[in-house]
Amino acid sequence: MSDRVSQCISCGSTNFKYYTENKTLKVPIYICQNCKLHVTGESQKQLDDILKKLYENNFWDMERNEGLNDSHTDTYSVSRKRLFLSQIKYVKKFLTKNSKILEIGSGHGETLIELDKLNFQTTGIEPDLKNVEHLRKILKKSKIIHSSIENLDIDEKFDFIWMSHVFEHLSDPISFLNNIKKNMHKPYFLFIEVPSVTKKKDYRKFTVVPHAYNYSGIALQNVLKKTGYKIISCDYFGPPTKLNGGMNKISTKIFKKDYYPFYPKMLLDADTGEDIRVIAQYSGMS
């Protein structure tokens, strides 16, 4: 059954072309020729079964976990904290001191810990029990729940959803975007960051990572609009060059502020940006 490539979930097109095989999941990847959405697998049931077995076998962050430490000073954790510094600058005008934040996919906890330090009341959702047990020991104002997003069952309501490099792992993003509405105050904001498929001369190719979908900016916006969300912003980001770093260092030393507004990440265009960031709002009117 080819239900995942019978019609594009983003634009409705039926024009897909085979791209390559996902080497981790052992299923084909197809590309929608209209919106450039990359679709992993042909059968929804087959993909769900494969992903379930993969994560039950602790694949999630398996390789990275070997280099992680509880003080979060390892290379991966430091890079995630740097990413957070850029992301919080991007979203801060949509947050208040009373905002209740729901982070989907907390991982090792870098974002959750930093939000906790800023005194935001944040709840993290994380399927990896090892990560959950570690975070419960160090969080102060915030909390972490051991659950997959598919099995999430909580009575609380939130004002802001934070998803950093998680949305691309969802095999049924339309259902997620609709189902999560019951846990949110209306109106609410949603922040998503995902890898971009539109960067030219991209070394990544997306052939190894267990992503259910990989998005272009248009495809991501279409999926959100389809479920009633209003797009506030959609931008492309990437790492700074040495020149960017030097300019920013001079600015912080002399003027006590960043030269680039979202440093240590750079606001780029679709051809050069590695990642897509979207802020969307759901008002409950649709």
Where are the language model's segments positioned?
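Conserved N-terminal segment of class I S-adenosyl-L-methionine
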Residues: 1-164, 174-177, 236-237, 249, ...
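A short glycine-rich, Lys/Arg-flanked "PGG" loop and its adjoining helix->strand segment in the class I
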Residues: 174-189
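Short, glycine-/aromatic-enriched active-site segment of Class I SAM-dependent methyltransferases
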Residues: 191-223
